[in-house]
Every structure is written in structure tokens, then in C-alpha cells.
Amino acid sequence: MSAQVIAIDAMGGDFGPRSIVQASIACLSATPSLHLTLVGQPSLLEDLISGLPAADRARLQIVAASEVVGMDERPSQALRGKPDSSMRIALELVRDGKAQACVSAGNTGALMALSRFVLKTLPGIDRPAMVAAIPTQTGYCQLLDLGANVDCSAENLYQFAVMGSVAAQALGVHRPRVALLNIGTEDIKGNQQVKLAATLLQSARGLNYVGFVEGDGLYRGEADVVVCDGFVGNILLKSSEGLATMIGARIEKLFKGGAFARVAGAVAMPLLKRLQADLAPARHNGASFLGLQGIVIKSHGSAGVQGFQSAIQRALIEIQENLPQRLHGRLEDLLP
């Protein structure tokens, strides 16, 4: 298998580079064909990888960056005021063909602005969209947009649907069912932009559009791709993650309530732990910026080692599936 090269913004996120470097080392150990470029402060990064075996160290490069984009900085500040930020340098490595993907846990708005500036969008795409996998009763669905575009036109939603369908196919879904998230399934429901987007999708050639889906239908697995604006999508994503964490905590507390509960817990806990692990936000961490001329994966800023590993794994899949090129080819067929 040919090598995959991923640029890592090692300075992004809420907790600094330690967990990012630990996740990077774990991915190197698990994937012999993987090469990583850590972008950030060299002296700090060298200390964190000092104990790495020589075989893995040979597949790990450090590129210096003197600036860091803060989590509370405006995108315009990152774009104009920090030309040597770790985030920007990582994206430029992708642009220059020195890496095939970029993974960052940094400021979402800044990452999107820099990605659009450095990598540019694919022909026909007005705005990139953030997409991630959401667990359902039957497997997973791809949900987009997750916060990159708070206000969306019908044309934006249509483009998101096309991109989400291609991404789902790249992940192995045959003829993915595409739906618009709405407050009801009837044609009269929804705001004007959602209704107009539905009209566009109904006439789309080669797209398996199945209509509107409500929030509960998403979790029942009624669609493989669910499209909404970034305001709704971000709230849905964060609510889902909070609910999964809360349920896990409540179950653990329940089985510590008394002697009988502890006995029942000893029997049930292995299965419940498996369920908790399957639904854990860390397992599904890593949102893809679809619509760019390059692969960019956004990790949660609060992601730990396991979560950042998941983001790197998503980048690996998109490299292996050559996702931007696949998108470009399908967009020519599906966009009006």
C-alpha cells in the first residue's frame, strides 16, 4: 500500500499538543503506511516524541510554525494576522502536495476561512460544509452542515446533499438515501429555504432523495445522509453528544445504587460498556470539510487521545477513497 501523508496542526485545540501527539503516535503504530507531519513549536514537539521507537520516528516529521490561532480569535485575525500559524502551515502542506490531508482541533471558524483561502473550493461549490457520522439504530448517517454555514440558501442545501451523498458512497453506502431535516415530513412543513431545496432535490438526476426527515427519524436510521443548515446541525450534534454522555453516566450511577444493583451491574455492565463505547462522541470525532480542493478534518477542540485518533482515521479513509477527486467528478453530473 502506498504511503499516506497527513499534516497535523499540533498546536490547535483546548489542551495543547500533548494529547494530539499521543494520538498521532498511536496512529503511526497502528498504520504502517501512515506518515505524519506535526506542525508547531519544534522544541516542544521534540520533547513529546523523544521516546518514540526509531521505526515510527522515521515516519514522523516536524515542521516549524511560530504562531498559534487562539480558540477565541476571529477568522479574519487568523487569515490576515497570522501567516505563520500552525493551522495555516498545515493547510499549505496540503496545497503544495507535501501532505494529502490536514487534521486540526483548532478554531472552527478560522480553520474554515483558512481552508477556503489556501485550498479553494471545488468548481460549482459556493460553500464547503462540515459533515460527520451520527450513530443511528441501523448504523450511521452523515449529517451536514454542522456549523460552518449558519444561514443557507436552498442552493447551498442542494449542494450539501450532493456532497453528502458522494461522501456516503465513499464510505461504502450503496445508493445513499438523502433527506432534508425538517419539523415534519409533510410537504407544507418547513421554512422557505427548506421547501425550495426539496423542490431542487426532487428533480435531481442520480440522487436518491427520500424527502423530509424529523429528528427522531434521523436516529431511527431513515436516511443515510441528512442535510440542514449549520445552526440546526451544530445544535443537533452537540445535543446528541451530551445525551450520549449523560446516558452513560446515569447507567453507571444506577448500577452503583445498592447490593442488588451492583450484582445486576456486574452481569449487564460488559454489554452496556460496549454500547457506551459505540455511542461515545470520541469514537465519532472528526468532521470533514466537504467541497474543498483538499482533505481537511476538524477534530473537537476538547478531544482527547481517542477522539483525535478518530479524526486521523477519518482523514485516512478520505485519502484512500480519493474523496475530493470523486466529489469533483460527481459534481459535474449532479450540479445544475
UniProtKB/Swiss-Prot annotation:
Keywords: Cytoplasm, Lipid biosynthesis, Lipid metabolism, Phospholipid biosynthesis, Phospholipid metabolism, Transferase
GO MF term list: phosphate:acyl-[acyl carrier protein] acyltransferase activity
Role this protein plays: Catalyzes the reversible formation of acyl-phosphate (acyl-PO(4)) from acyl-[acyl-carrier-protein] (acyl-ACP). This enzyme utilizes acyl-ACP as fatty acyl donor, but not acyl-CoA.
Family the UniProt entry places it in: Belongs to the PlsX family.
Gene3D superfamilies cross-referenced by the UniProt entry: Isopropylmalate Dehydrogenase
Subunit comment: Homodimer. Probably interacts with PlsY.
Location of this chain's protein in the cell: Cytoplasm
PANTHER family: FATTY ACID/PHOSPHOLIPID SYNTHESIS PROTEIN PLSX, PHOSPHATE ACYLTRANSFERASE
Reaction it catalyzes: a fatty acyl-[ACP] + phosphate = an acyl phosphate + holo-[ACP]
Any one of the GO CC terms: cytoplasm
Listed EC numbers: 2.3.1.274
Protein's UniProt name: Phosphate acyltransferase
GO biological process: fatty acid biosynthetic process; phospholipid biosynthetic process
Species assigned in the record: Pseudomonas putida (strain ATCC 700007 / DSM 6899 / JCM 31910 / BCRC 17059 / LMG 24140 / F1)
InterPro entries: FA_synthesis (IPR003664), Phospholipid_synth_PlsX-like (IPR012281)
Pathway named in the protein's UniProt entry: Lipid metabolism; phospholipid metabolism
